[in-house]
Amino acid sequence: AAQDDATILAIRDQERAGLDIITDGEMRRESYSNRFATALDGVDVDNPGVALDRSGHPNPVPRVTGPVRRKYPVEVRDVQFLRANTDRKIKITVAGPFTMSQQAQNDFYDSEEALALDYAAAVNEEIRDLFKAGADIVQLDEPYMQARPEKARAYGLKALNRALEGIEGETAVHICFGYAAIIHVRPSGYSFLPELTQSPVRCVSIETAQSSLDCAI
């Protein structure tokens, strides 16, 4: 009930601000990715692993111990609640498969690519259910494409394309610039962006408040 109340407040704030596209404020999530990543089969949530974050610091992460599969729709109720509480266009976000593969300790798969592709299959199932539930836009959050561009080129784009395979609704992908990380020397542009022309994604969301950021691709 408290999360529902907080979500309604977030919706009304966005409406009063005049936003055309409304989100639920993600009040129900402990993080942008773990809400989905820890709800999957093949993940040991009781004994987490360790992986390096975007700034190189070790963090507790989901530990993959078996085949990654979606057990049930994770965010469908979020969409249904959002749809019932606004008449504006609505957007929901899901953690991207490449990013989830980078935020996991892989104790099962022979390669990170195989892990990312199974995450992608689970995300694909989720996206289909989110559109059925009333989402107008589904966005995949892929901050690690900017943080680890070589791996993103090697198999991240393949995983993203698998996640979007056969999807007909409006989709977006968000790539962070890394504002949350304590990095003293910041790059002036994105390390992974033109590559998204090889994806069926219809919209690219980037961060552009960074001083001196060159938005050219």
Where in the sequence are the language-model features?
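Domain-level signal for soluble alpha/beta catalytic cores
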Residues: A1-I217
